[in-house]
């Protein structure tokens, strides 16, 4: 009689768990629901350390946890077998939406405060920021300006987080994203996404590591860096961008430059999403010009779910729902007609 509870528990776990290396993900959750989880990187992995010299902390000045990571999945929705890694502060509205599309989502704690500390020389070296981004993402030695070991890189923290999620929330099918031998993530099933600084690091990482797609809100930037023109392990048709025309990134040709150097012009023209319905001519370059009262700061953060996003005056509902779904789910092989490079967009920028 004493063995019955253990047997029942084992049976329950076997019903919910996912075998590593599966070709297709299917949920087997006896109580389908929207799961939302949090965990500290330092509690998941004892190797995690703080790097105060670049503002990469485990606790803030008040002693509060600074390394909390977020994850969510909705097992009521048929899974697409794709994992979104969000490279910015947690955005509940965005996570709710990508979960509703059938996507898993996590936000990992990684080094992203270095931007105001490192690469301050003028002119800045053309590889300086790109190399730090790659080291922050991989935990490998690409830069002399920082020292970020493997356990503190985005790749390893994402891997350790997904392993933890697989144990804590087997109903969510997180094990699907682990390699067959359980030693890493299935990166070709990962969607790298971020805004501004986070979108820039996402795109830099995708040059190095083949991923399912990149979703860049208000980015990438790095107008004085050359990494955008490097060969890409991620096919060019998998990069998607969305920004507001009053965002300062357009004033300095940051976005047009990055988008063209990444090859996004080969898959369609700039499309104003407020004037064309989805699927937006299958393009990769999406813009909006809705009224932000001339506020460039609002424009910069207006293209993702949040208080500054475009909402209907009468309904109060978001007006870019179709855009967000397109960015994360549009078939990568469905592409628009190639366009020429814009001669008015300055590609060779110097400080």
Regions found by a protein language model. Give the residues of each.
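Conserved alpha/beta-hydrolase
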Residues: 102-119
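N-terminal cap/lid segment of alpha/beta-hydrolase-fold proteins
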Residues: 23-76
């Amino acid at each position: 009689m004493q063995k019955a509870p253990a047997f029942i528990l084992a049976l329950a776990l076997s019903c919910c768990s996912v075998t590593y290396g599966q070709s297709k993900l299917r949920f087997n959750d006896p109580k389908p629901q929207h799961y939302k989880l949090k965990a500290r990187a330092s509690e998941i992995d004892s190797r995690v350390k703080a790097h105060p010299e670049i503002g990469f902390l485990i606790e803030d000045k008040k002693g509060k946890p600074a390394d909390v990571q977020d994850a969510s999945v909705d097992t009521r929705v048929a899974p697409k077998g794709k994992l979104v890694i969000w490279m910015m502060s947690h955005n509940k509205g965005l996570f709710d939406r990508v979960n509703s599309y059938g996507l898993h989502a996590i936000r990992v704690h990684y080094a992203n405060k270095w931007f105001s500390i490192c690469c301050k020389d003028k002119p800045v070296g053309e590889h300086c920021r790109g190399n730090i981004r790659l080291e922050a993402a991989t935990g490998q030695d690409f830069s002399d300006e920082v020292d970020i070991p493997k356990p503190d890189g985005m790749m390893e923290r994402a891997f350790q987080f997904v392993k933890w999620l697989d144990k804590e929330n087997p109903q969510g099918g997180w094990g699907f994203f682990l390699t067959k031998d359980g030693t890493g993530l299935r990166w070709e099933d990962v969607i790298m996404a971020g805004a501004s600084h986070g979108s820039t690091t996402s795109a830099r990482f995708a040059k190095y590591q083949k991923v399912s797609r990149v979703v860049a809100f208000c980015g990438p930037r790095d107008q004085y860096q050359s990494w955008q023109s490097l060969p890409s392990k991620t096919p060019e048709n998998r990069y998607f961008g969305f920004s507001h025309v009053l965002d300062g990134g357009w004033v300095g040709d940051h976005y047009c430059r990055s988008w063209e150097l990444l090859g996004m012009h080969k898959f369609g023209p700039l499309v104003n999403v407020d004037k064309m319905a989805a699927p937006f001519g299958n393009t990769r370059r999406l813009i909006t010009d809705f009224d932000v009262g001339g506020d460039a700061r609002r424009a910069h953060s207006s293209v993702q779910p949040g208080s500054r996003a475009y909402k209907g005056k009468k309904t109060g509902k978001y007006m870019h729902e179709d855009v967000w779904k397109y960015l994360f789910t549009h078939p990568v092989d469905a592409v628009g007609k190639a366009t020429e490079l814009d001669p008015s967009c300055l590609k060779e920028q110097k400080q």
